[in-house]
Amino acid sequence: MVRREQSNAERGLVLRTERCSIHDGHGIRTVVFLKGCPLNCWWCSTPESQSFEIEHAEGNTYGTYMTVEEVMKEIRKDSAFYFHSGGGMTLSGGEILAQPDFARSILRVCRNECISTAIETSLCSSWENAASILPYVNTAFVDFKLVDNALHRKYCGIGNRLIHQNLIK
């Protein structure tokens, strides 16, 4: 029997999860780092998140495919901390909008379970992708890398016009 692949809304490429974070939004949070980013910033704090593929280097594996339920199982582990600290879950990356259906599914389940949601994004995606997740987001951190388009292209690998247009919207 051939196993059918799950849809993008139910399965995505996750770099890692970090529990009990206090740096990615208010209160104590679980941060889910998605893998894959259209940018290639020279100063990226998580360069292992840039590739859209699972990578193996120096005995480490970077990335694993997870279902929404598997991700939620990790998020729920710290739910008592969220409610007592005003925290919740933060989606980060990579670029979360590179996996918009998966990101939206995670955010939707969190909102349905009254878990506060935050995202970290460069907005380097279509506006439709961004707009589709915003109803499920409590806090958005937008990392606008460089104002100058030529410098953005030099240091991030692509220009910033799309990002700038999304910020205006």
Where are these regions (language model features)?
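Soluble or luminal CAZymes and related metallo-dependent hydrolases
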Residues: G63, T67-E70, L162
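N-terminal [4Fe-4S]-dependent radical SAM core
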Residues: M1-M66, K77-F83
